[in-house]
From Swiss-Prot:
K(+) binds at residues 227, 246, 248, 251. One of its GO terms (cellular component) is cytosol. Its EC number is 3.6.-.-. The gene is mnmE. This is tRNA modification GTPase MnmE. It is an enzyme of class 3 (hydrolase). GTP binds at residues 227-232, 246-252, 271-274. The lineage of its organism: Bacteria, Pseudomonadati, Elusimicrobiota, Endomicrobiia, Endomicrobiales. It comes from Endomicrobium trichonymphae. The keyword Kinase does not apply. Mg(2+) binds at residues 231, 252. Keywords: Cytoplasm, GTP-binding, Hydrolase, Magnesium, Metal-binding, Nucleotide-binding, Potassium, tRNA processing.
Length: 456
């Protein structure tokens, strides 16, 4: 990613397509000069928001409002202009082309936020939170991302980093002046403080699972024999007819995926083709192969049974498939068609020893109980509002930090190992700094910002 900081960049910052208003962002040292070439206004020079027209010098292209932000008090830390234009793609392209012709260049993915990072307007963890906030799927995930963007996660990292840095300084001073031991922290005090740092890191690591769930959602796959009511269950959960439902076995021949907000958790629910003992239909066979593929990617499995009939060879085949798959995920056994006389024998379920929920996809009875069970398994409480968005990069670096701190403590406990303890503590400090974006390799930065949308 070859982002030249000296360039002035421009891009559409609002969603593409027709809308009432679209915002074009222009950032860089020459932003004011470039916009001055195509923006004509009668507003007073001291006004920050100015009304006028975009023109190519011959004719007007649009009536707009331009907001001027002077460096360094801007999102990027540079001179920045936001053009509020009418949201017609034809007009937007004309304005962008005029900006490019007059000295700006198209911004790359996340380049505005990248410049904010380079200009110390935010650290790397906060920049990543910007992307997480934009892509949030639920209100709770947006709150978690905003908490991180507001600096709550960074503050915790800085506190641990500063504590480690102070301990390193004490250890280095101790090594330089071994005869003045009484002037520095005692060994027991150092061990106690490292213990505190370890606990703080462990608490953040424990937040990773929740952050991952809020950011990416939970994949819930519905599996069962043909006509168990899988598609009806999907429709009942969604509250609309998304999947085709008939009395003909094998109606669903492909996976159908939908996402819902369940108590703040994004649930990615997949309806699958039914698995049965014998099938000569090629399309159905291919559908069953996709079912097996979806099961292997699931976070939670809903195994659906028809409670109005006895378990048969198809149920047994699914049980055998799950056993051979050796899945290490929660499986919820759901007895569907509770509105009909029960004929289902629980012997198969007793052997499986899984959570059991009774529902009727037709009437909606038990659907809320099923969703409650999924939320319970996820372990995310909607009443909490202090969640943080900790991503995989942070998790790996926090793990590295934890391992380094544990080795530091072990070395401090041993005799004549102070230099090793100091080295390990420095490793922890480096990992913590990387989370904040200090001394991070360019290829890592390129990877992070390439996931952003253009215009942010």
């Amino acid at each position: 990613m070859n982002y030249l900081k000296e360039d002035t960049i421009a891009a559409l910052s609002t969603a593409a397509g027709k809308s009432a208003i679209a915002v074009i962002r222009l950032s860089g040292e020459n932003s004011f000069q470039i916009i001055g070439k195509i923006f004509k206004t009668h507003s007073k020079p001291e006004q920050q928001v100015k009304h006028g027209y975009i023109t190519d010098g011959i004719e007007k292209k649009d009536e707009v409002l331009c907001t001027f932000f002077k460096a360094p008090h801007t999102y990027t830390g540079e001179n920045l202009v936001e053009i509020a234009a009418h949201g017609n793609p034809v007009i937007i392209n004309e304005i962008l082309n005029l900006l490019y012709k007059n000295g700006a260049r198209p911004a790359g993915p996340g380049e505005f936020t990248y410049r904010a990072f380079l200009n110390d307007k935010m650290n790397l963890a906060e920049a990543e939170a910007v992307c997480a906030l934009i892509t949030s799927k639920t209100e709770m995930s947006a709150k978690a991302a905003l908490n991180s963007l507001s600096g709550e996660f960074s503050s915790k990292i800085k506190n641990i980093r500063d504590a480690v840095t102070n301990l390193i300084a004490s250890m280095e001073a101790n090594l330089d002046h071994p005869d003045e031991d009484n002037m520095f922290l005692s060994r027991s005090e150092k061990l106690s403080r490292f213990d505190s740092c370890i606990k703080d890191v462990q608490n953040l690591l424990n937040s990773y699972k929740t952050g991952k769930i809020l950011q990416y959602g939970i994949k819930v796959v519905i599996i069962g024999k043909p006509n168990a009511g899988k598609s009806s269950l999907l429709n009942a959960i969604l509250g609309k007819n998304r999947a085709i439902v008939t009395d003909i076995a094998g109606t669903t021949t492909d996976t159908v995926e939908e996402t819902i907000d369940c108590c703040g958790i994004p649930l990615i629910i997949t309806d699958t083709a039914g698995i049965r003992e014998h099938s000569e239909n090629l399309i159905e066979i291919l559908g069953q192969a996709k079912t097996r593929e979806a099961v292997c990617k699931a976070d939670i499995l809903i195994w659906l049974f028809d409670s109005s009939s006895e378990p048969d060879c198809n149920d047994a085949k699914i049980a055998d498939f799950l056993k051979k798959s050796d899945l290490n995920i929660p499986i919820i056994c759901v007895l569907n068609k509770s509105d009909l006389p029960p004929l289902f024998s629980s012997s198969l379920l007793n052997r499986e020893n899984k959570v059991k929920v009774k529902i009727s996809a037709k009437t909606g009875v038990g659907i809320a109980d099923l969703l409650d069970e999924i939320v319970k398994i996820a372990g995310v409480s909607e009443s909490k509002n202090d969640y943080l968005m900790i991503n995989t990069r942070h998790f790996i670096l926090l793990q590295n930090t934890l391992e380094s701190l544990i080795r530091t403590k072990q070395s401090l406990s041993a005799k004549d190992a102070d230099e090793i303890a100091c080295f390990e503590a420095l490793s922890a400090q480096i990992s913590l700094n990387e989370i904040l974006g200090i001394n991070v390799k360019q290829d890592i930065l390129d990877t992070i910002f390439s996931t952003f949308c253009i215009g942010k």
